[in-house]
Amino acid sequence: MASRPSVRHPSHNHPLRGHKAQVEDEIICSGCDLDLLGAYFKCTKSECDYFLHKSCFDLPREIRHKSHPDHPLILLYSPQNNNSTYTCDACGEYGSGFTYNCSICQYDVHVGCVSVPETMKHDEHVHPLALIYKAPCPKDHIFTCDVCDETMPHNLWLYYCQKCDYGAHLHSCVAEEEEKSKKGGRGRGGEGGSGGNGVNRGRSSANSELAAMLKAQREMEQMQIALHLEMQRAKIDKKSRKHMLKMI
């Protein structure tokens, strides 16, 4: 039986081979740090745990984005300057895999945040919300998310209705879409409701993937904080032991 052909990707030193993810696999993509869904590539070396969604494999190397019009964003396969993580300038969460980056401005965006929809319908507001890339008020004013009541940093992306001065950060809108998708992808009735057509099911699926990404990034941030605290405690314990030995 002939073996499946292998392919190369600039993010990894070894050849990759195509596979189809199973629900029970629980494997993390090395590009976006999310659970593998659908088609993916795996390193041909048995001892190498490198996995990549086909969608991450196919990401363009350079893009232009409305959030950063002055310079192109370049796809990086790991954080800059040998850092283990970066902070996304769209949602404010950590990332450790692929990022779209402007080295001139030190601007980073998750590969998932780059593709969020430009408009979003939220059940708590009558009008569609438009994606904007900073808070719609002066920096000395406080802007609060109308969904979760959290204060929103001025430099992060949000969904906003200018007519009503109603805004919600990415997490709030995406969390609602995730709940809708769990219930079968159905939105509100009447005009703009999903009604079960294929286009809205696809949009719901994409928003569900984004919600999973943001959830994974928040969990990663918590793990990194816990690891940092553990390292600090270890350093303190080591210094204490040295001090005790000097006293003996």
Swiss-Prot record:
The keyword Ribonucleoprotein does not apply. GO terms for molecular function: zinc ion binding. The keyword Zinc-finger applies. Keywords: Endosome, Membrane, Metal-binding, Repeat, Signal, Zinc, Zinc-finger. A zinc finger (ZZ-type) spans 24-81, 83-137. Residues 125-173 are annotated as: VLG 3. Residues 179-207 are annotated as: Disordered. Induction: Highly activated by bacterial elicitors (e.g. flg22 and HrpZ) and fungal/oomycete elicitors (e.g. NPP1). Transiently induced by the pathogenic bacteria Pseudomonas syringae pv. tomato DC3000. It is found in: Endomembrane system; Prevacuolar compartment; Endosome, Multivesicular body. Disruption phenotype: Missing formation of the large vacuole required early in development of male and female gametophytes thus leading to development arrest in embryo sacs and pollen grains at the first mitotic division. Expressed in gametophytes (both male and female), seedlings, hypocotyls, cotyledons, leaf primordia, leaves, sepals, flowers and roots. Zn(2+) 1 binds at residues 29, 32, 53, 56. Residues 68-113 are annotated as: VLG 2. It holds the Pfam family C1_2. Zn(2+) 2 binds at residues 102, 105, 122, 127. InterPro entries: C1-like_sf (IPR046349), DC1 (IPR004146), Znf_ZZ_sf (IPR043145). Interacts with PVA12 and LTL1 at the endomembrane system. This is Protein VACUOLELESS GAMETOPHYTES. It comes from Arabidopsis thaliana (Mouse-ear cress). The gene is VLG.
